[in-house]
Amino acid sequence: MIRLLDGFPDNVIAISGGGRISREDYENVVIPRIEAAARQHRTLRCYYEIGADFAGIDPAALWDDFRVGIEYWRRWERVAAVTDVAWIAQMVNAFRFLMPGQVRVFPNSDKEAARAWIMAD
């Protein structure tokens, strides 16, 4: 399940994922939020917390993540992935060189540093 997080500027898509993440999470939560931010801002930022209760992601959701990332590819200014899930951290680090903006992975213990970084000028 994915939910939106409060306390971030409008250009930051701030989400938290836990349990099993589905295509419906992307279609009903993530994609509408990205589209709304993209209508108002030239550049976008993403803050994505993946909780300790993360139980996996459906292949269709992974595809939606990839697709929406590519659709707005040039607009991603910063991406912060906050996770202790090793394979997610490795995947983000492996693909970050493809992103035009800055991408960082933070452990869950550094959430506050990740939040500060994603909102910094």
Where are these regions (language model features)?
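Amphipathic, Lys/Arg-enriched alpha-helical "gate/interface" segment within cytosolic domains
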Residues: 2-121
